[in-house]
């Protein structure tokens, strides 16, 4: 795929996965036993900053009905086919929740800059939200250098059964002394487990402090045991 096509694809996935309440991206596979999850590196994406960032589309999987797993070697081929066709297939039985994350590649600014770029991609993919937060997203990413890289954490949402929607809420706080330090907080995760045939959700929240101010981001994934 050409680089422009990759840009369009990443924008489409981010926009739908994080801003459409009923977004549903699934791959008709049955998952793989163990901790390893199928993923595909789609290349260097120019996101209009000083340098490109490596972006990875990761497909966490959750077997929903049975434990008959396919050969892991075919997973990447099917995902590649789905991406090359600009399509992400759906399945009634086996869901792949799409997470888009920045890889912790080597950078003089450490992982906080990479993570901030990842957040900027999410926000920047929706012009309406981006325009209400700031005029120049580049300035928002102007974070100071870190002495060492911290353990890179992704914004992950685990779904035990099925899922029916995802939404993200944003809140921009005015400049303050804390934001001038240019730090990011740890991700705080929490989930509400499913009860008997009822609905639940898995929620993550984080905050990024920068010279432009503080932005608080919360993502909630709703799911239902009836799916």
From Swiss-Prot:
It is found in: Mitochondrion. Essential for mitochondrial protein synthesis and required for the maturation of small ribosomal subunits. It comes from the Eukaryota. Belongs to the universal ribosomal protein uS3 family. GO terms for biological process: mitochondrial translation. GO terms for molecular function: structural constituent of ribosome. Component of the mitochondrial small ribosomal subunit (mt-SSU). Mature yeast 74S mitochondrial ribosomes consist of a small (37S) and a large (54S) subunit. The 37S small subunit contains a 15S ribosomal RNA (15S mt-rRNA) and at least 32 different proteins. The 54S large subunit contains a 21S rRNA (21S mt-rRNA) and at least 45 different proteins. uS3m, uS4m and uS5m form the narrow entry site of the mRNA channel. Its main location: mitochondrion. The keyword ATP-binding does not apply. This is Small ribosomal subunit protein uS3m. The keyword Mitochondrion applies. Pfam families: VAR1. Coiled coil: none annotated. Keywords: Mitochondrion, Ribonucleoprotein, Ribosomal protein. It comes from Schizosaccharomyces pombe (strain 972 / ATCC 24843) (Fission yeast). One of its GO terms (cellular component) is mitochondrial small ribosomal subunit.
